[in-house]
Amino acid sequence: LPLLLVVFGFAALQAVILNKAMSLVVVTAAFVFRSAAVPLVEVASNWTTVANLLAGSLIGAWSAAGWATRWQGATLQRVIAALLLVVAVVLLFGHESDAKHPALEGAWLIAAGVAAGLLIGAVASLLGVAGGELLIPTLVLLYGVDIKLAGSLSLAVSLPTMVAGFARYSRDRSFTVLRANRAFVLSMAAGSIFGAAIGGLCLGAVP
């Protein structure tokens, strides 16, 4: 996203939409390539966790995309800058855990999952990202999921969440940026798929 804004000079909303489109490609590709190291059967067996987070993230993604289309460019840029700072802090401190069990149980866990999903869906939609930066720490810390499995579960949550945000953005006239920059989008998507393939293959070698 910063590259789209600073290096390529896209307006804030256009950059978010472009980033969302390319992230959707990456998530789809990564989900496939990771299946060798994390079987889809294992992902499917944790469907309740995925559903719990989706209950909030779908609403958050749709709502936040609506906000983004109404905000002025400068306002959206300030929101993006603040959220990127928050994500940086989460990335710095959010993965240091060896949790093996859920932090909460029963209705409390469900409520916390919906709330976390709502927040993550909104942030992901506003930044045009998949949300794994926040989903993985949430899955590890809140649900006690293994880090490798958390990566695949985050993709299972991200894909429907991104589709929801993408559908809302498609109603705005800025969505035409995808058609106007088709060659750019395709080249970035191709590179992203290649990177996702390398990452998926390397996952099996990482302890």
Ranges and model annotations:
Residues 163-171:
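Membrane-water interface of transmembrane alpha-helices
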